[in-house]
Amino acid sequence: MLIGIAYLALFLAAGLLLARWAVPDGSPAVAVPLGCGFGVSLLAALPAGFALVCGFTLRAVWLAAAGAALLCAVLIFAGRGHIRFARDPDRGAMWLCLLPVLAVTLYLLHTHVLHKVNGTLHTGQSCYGDMPMHLGFIEYIAQSGQFPPRDPLLAGAHRCGYPFLCETVSSVFRLLGAGRRAAYLLPMVPAFVSVYGMFWQL
């Protein structure tokens, strides 16, 4: 779990630096949500890119981490003297709105998603059959190491036609030793920050 959190932090740092480079005059209200979006996108793309060469394995996961660290180093070197953010034009109004909504979201994720009850997983998330499908893809990618993955719903007889990059993010955390629930929830937190923050920018 701690390794997964550190891994996520590395990619979020890369995303934040990338956002700082993309919007050099942006305030934290712009850079943090954009950086979270970039970070989660990198977390989907980099391990998948290496997995095309060496399968979806720990080797691909650590090569992706090296790529993210290299990106951080390049962006820090390229942006020397320009790390400071601009002041928030709305003087923190976004954070006053976003943080309570994020707190409620985190509470609901903690209390309603994937709890063990008598050895089985229970959830209050209203997604019906969608969650078991996603969990199946996540587990299959992590366990099989095949990439691009086969479709586990069709006994692996066909390549997966579902847009599976969203599943690889959680599969990375499964390979790093996170439990099923932690792997499912970890990438949701920065994704929610990104979505809520970008809605504010609209």
Where on the chain are the PLM-derived regions?
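Active-site lumenal/periplasmic loops and adjacent helix-entry segments of GT-C-fold
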Residues: 104-201
